A protein has these predicted regions:
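Short, well-ordered coil/turn segments that N-cap beta-strands
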Residues: 12-17, 54-56
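Short, hydrophobic/aliphatic alpha-helical segments
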Residues: 8-13, 49, 145
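Short, solvent-exposed loop/turn segments at secondary-structure boundaries
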Residues: 30-35
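Aromatic/hydrophobic pocket-lining residues that form the small-molecule binding cavity
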Residues: 1-2, 37
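Glycine-rich beta-strand-to-loop/alpha-helix junction loops that act as flexible
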Residues: 19-26, 62-64
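Structural alpha-helical segments in enzyme catalytic/regulatory domains
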Residues: 39-53
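Charged (often Lys/Glu-rich) extended helix/loop segments that serve as interaction or gating elements
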Residues: 43, 54-171
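Short, well-ordered amphipathic alpha-helical segments that serve as non-catalytic structural scaffolds
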Residues: 2-9, 43-47
Length: 171
């Protein structure tokens, strides 16, 4: 469709110098297959060249692909809660610190900071905010003890910019 639009613009006497493909370059949080940005650019350049638009400068905003891995949220397990249905690690960090899991159901890697002799159990990692949606990760196998330190990695994209003082919590 873009090539059709470029052809219509050219037919109307409008020649562009740049073409901006915006953002949306993927990030591998878990086991997704993310096309390397080089492949995307080479593919775009090839299609533009084949269609007679090789003069266009390609502009892209790499966004999350640059900053996601540059940040992590460090938190401490405050309590271990066990119910007949599920086990929970309640941390001192919550949805006000990292909203993406609660808001978008974003899968974020969670790793223990130290090696532990504690048994590893399937947990939901949740925060201290009085909201049922205050969770950082679901169904993770982690050490089960108060005082454990956890790192929620890949939090550089929108982690700080979307953090808030919701529910009178400090940043």
């Amino acid at each position: 469709r873009l090539l059709d639009l470029l052809k219509k613009l050219r037919a109307a006497g409008i020649e562009l110098k740049d073409i901006d493909f915006g953002g949306g370059v993927g990030v591998c949080y878990r086991d997704e297959t993310v096309e390397p940005i080089e492949n995307l650019v080479l593919g775009l350049k090839s299609r533009l060249t084949q269609s007679g638009f090789d003069h266009l400068r390609i502009v892209m905003e790499p966004g999350r692909s640059i900053v996601a891995a540059a940040g992590l949220l460090l938190c401490s397990v405050q309590y271990v809660k066990t119910t007949p249905v599920k086990h929970f690690l309640i941390t001192d960090a919550g949805m006000n610190d990292l909203i993406r899991p609660a808001l978008y159901a974003a899968w974020m890697p969670v790793l223990p900071i130290r090696q532990s002799d504690c048994p590893e159990v399937l947990f939901d990692v949740v925060g201290p905010v009085c909201e049922s949606s205050d969770w950082l990760a679901r169904d993770r196998v982690l050490p089960a003890q108060a005082g454990e330190l956890l790192a929620v990695t890949m939090a550089g994209a929108y982690g700080m910019s979307m953090a808030s003082r919701y529910n009178s919590r400090r940043l």
